[in-house]
Curated annotation (Swiss-Prot):
A Pfam family this chain is assigned to: MatE
Membrane-crossing residue ranges in chain numbering: 97-117, 127-147, 176-196, 204-224, 240-260, 272-292, 316-336, 344-364, 390-410, 435-455, 462-482, 491-511
An MF annotation (GO) of this entry: xenobiotic transmembrane transporter activity
Subcellular location: Membrane
Gene name in the database record: DTX34
Keyword annotations of the record: Membrane, Transmembrane, Transmembrane helix, Transport
UniProt name for this protein: Protein DETOXIFICATION 34
Organism: Arabidopsis thaliana (Mouse-ear cress)
Species classification: Eukaryota, Viridiplantae, Streptophyta, Embryophyta, Tracheophyta
Amino acid sequence: MEIPVREERRSSSSSAGPLQQTISLAADDAIDSGPSSPLVVKVSVFETEHETTKLIHAPSTLLGETTGDADFPPIQSFRDAKLVCVVETSKLWEIAAPIAFNILCNYGVNSFTSIFVGHIGDLELSAVAIALSVVSNFSFGFLLGMASALETLCGQAFGAGQMDMLGVYMQRSWLILLGTSVCLLPLYIYATPLLILLGQEPEIAEISGKFTTQIIPQMFALAINFPTQKFLQSQSKVGIMAWIGFFALTLHIFILYLFINVFKWGLNGAAAAFDVSAWGIAIAQVVYVVGWCKDGWKGLSWLAFQDVWPFLKLSFASAVMLCLEIWYFMTIIVLTGHLEDPVIAVGSLSICMNINGWEGMLFIGINAAISVRVSNELGSGHPRAAKYSVIVTVIESLVIGVVCAIVILITRDDFAVIFTESEEMRKAVADLAYLLGITMILNSLQPVISGVAVGGGWQAPVAYINLFCYYAFGLPLGFLLGYKTSLGVQGIWIGMICGTSLQTLILLYMIYITNWNKEVEQASERMKQWGAGYEKLEKIAT
């Protein structure tokens, strides 16, 4: 009775596309192999037949579960393409949505700190805004960039089945980021003279410098927080991050009210609440890793002290790549502040950047998701799955960006009312709306491409590309158009758009010519190099 059933299944799958046939046949082989026999699945990777007898526990994009080890076969029909799109879309948003929500909650910690401080006084609000946007934002971007090396290493190690190395990589990153935080201490300690040197009013700089020294513990919390985040992201364990972010934001609001409104601690209370919330997030994530991530966490290990120098170089390349992007937009604001009528120029640009920042939170989530997808699939030896995940993500992100741009253009005369009642400011914002729309489209692609770069381990070349496109092309062009023509703030922004466009085109071309089979081989070599301690851990475990 078993044979006719199997023949019927194979017959029914013959009319489907190659992708669906592979799924059906793989499932048949799994059923017929029996519970006691090893699973043997024939899959097509690198255009040749391979037999795999050991499943890798990276998430399979083929079956949508953790029971598959096959790469996607080539797409040969619209039905195949549709199935790939459905599977990849599901995988993408399972990761991206919780990460985006977590980022929104973290952004809310800063926002509510400013809101509560704003009720203390305008001077205090200006001082805290400077402390958070200049000093804290600088260290935030640099530490986040340093931790991004884990997106490459943990993601590919997870795909390759080297689960024990995930905890080692995380501990190694903890050490490096804690050391980096020590190096960044002078920026906090000497914030007051540095801010005065940058042209800030002495009274504001004095208060800002005092607040900055009080939030030093928050910086060290980030050194623990970021590597732990990347550890969880690489395994797609992002739901817990969203819950921790939500409870942390709720607790932060309560502590702010308690310290500022009840205890009347003023700025000291705001700084204390900021530190407590940051460490609460870091500790909660570590507790979850130690208690519920037994596959990746095997306890503290001396292996974390091995290969620190090459790990540091990859971390530094990741930091430079990210910081060049963050500082690019900060520099645009600085240039705008030296134009005629800087109040309207900076105000209108800040409103547009604020709107762009809210859209950016979504794409930061997508950035992390595609980084996880690419690194997992390369580590698993799935070149087509990596390629298809990139294609699907780029298309969907572009559609979202276009929709956002259309909404901005339709409401260009009205959306600024959220931020200001000034008719002059609203008109200035409306004049910039078309540039905001173009920027939103570009920003729908740029984070995705950066995520692919991190997932593939391309940080160093992308850092050079960013340096050229942003600082050798975009900023000089913006300076010329803004100061040497009558375009003003629009000219500066056009220069920024040109730099971002050039960077996006270059990276899209890099992805277009990428040999994904070769990327799999490089990922395998990287795991052999970086996972030197994996065999030691296996021996210890046995």
